[in-house]
Amino acid sequence: MSVHPSLLLRATELIGHPVVTLEGGEAIAEVKDVVYGSAEASLLGFTLRHRGFLGGPMKQVLAWAQVVALGRHAVMIASAGDLAERDDVLAQEVKESRGRNVIDSEVLTDAGERLGEVTDVVILIDDGPEVVGYEIGGSEVLTPRSGGHVFVPLPETLAVSGEALIVPAAVHDFVTDDLAGFGAAVERFRDHLRTGSP
């Protein structure tokens, strides 16, 4: 896997993105929330709201399979028909995920050390969306140079359950406070876990 920095996004950056059709170039919705599949560590899709300052929630959702492209400024789909009513797998995940939001969860190492609390989820947009790390704050052991937050890479497989998120203790050496350099940190961390190399 090659991680390019321009393809790394915070999940919160996607909130408010217009959903635009390739068919007519029309912005038909906005991203309301990002639906994160905690068991799969992946982005499953989006809940939506109507466009505009007072736009309320929409009944339709947008599954990732229907997304043609995702950039820093818009979510592109083929046509308005790609939005689905809330009776599919995505809607079920939204229902089940209530009460187990990753944001504000504690991050602990498998050695029992508290690293901080999740403030955002970092997503790699490549062949498919993959959650590759967390932005965390409130750390007493990690001291960022600026902004008070750091980025913690995740292993290739990570099951999330309960109130705390557990990461390998080796993550210490791969934490960064720079999102632009975070992709390289993810690759080095995963290589280290696979091979045990420094």
Range-by-range predicted roles:
Residues 1-198:
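Peripheral interaction segments used for macromolecular assembly
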